[in-house]
């Protein structure tokens, strides 16, 4: 009767579109309290967009976005593309120099002769700059100018209309 219950559980999950490879996985699921999905392009559209711009220290949202878009001008990364799209203009490449990519962290470079750092919390820690905690469901891109925090840009991916609700 125990094998029958495993077949029944695996079959019921299959009817809901969930593949369980075997009874040992089904047993492990019985102890599960939290499930996290990271399925860009499956549950989400895979189209990142700027959801919010949070400037600080006497800078406007437009200025913060302009700085970020210029530093991301050479990148094809989805986050960079979303920032450039939100900016809506072609960046003036003469204003940008010495751009360096820090894989998985962000980018650094010069914009109008100012040193700019754009990236996640890890690169901010690496630069020994304390940034405010931001409660957001999206990806947070922090912006520094000459070592001073300017604000952040929140990037989000949209959930597909036909994605099942969790």
List the model feature ranges, each with a label.
Residues 1-166:
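Cytosolic catalytic headpiece of P-type ATPases
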